Regions:
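Short basic helix-loop element that most often maps to the first helix and adjoining turn
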Residues: 8-27, 52
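DNA major-groove recognition helix of helix-turn-helix
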Residues: 39, 49, 68
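Short, basic-rich loop-to-helix N-cap that marks the start of a DNA-contacting helix
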Residues: 42-55, 73
Length: 76
């Protein structure tokens, strides 16, 4: 999994909603520093946090993970 791509997608979805990292971390009940580490690609979220992020941001897991999983290259 490409942690940096996952982090960029979480960051983009958060910004589209007009939220700060502090706001999203409050909604997901996680530490703002941990969220910033996820968004920078330094950390991978736990499954529980990943699900909470998807629900809060109203995005599918596929949106956040597409192209970051092994074998996800387009099949022409």
């Amino acid at each position: 999994m490409d942690k940096k791509l996952l982090g960029r997608r979480i960051n983009a979805a958060r910004r589209e909603r007009g939220w700060t990292s502090e706001r999203l971390s409050e909604i997901c009940n996680i530490n703002a520093t941990y969220l910033r580490q996820i968004e920078s690609g330094a950390k991978t979220p736990s499954l529980q946090v990943f699900v909470e992020l998807c629900e809060a941001l109203k995005v599918s897991p596929t949106y956040l993970l597409a192209d970051s999983l092994p074998g996800a290259e387009s099949q022409d």
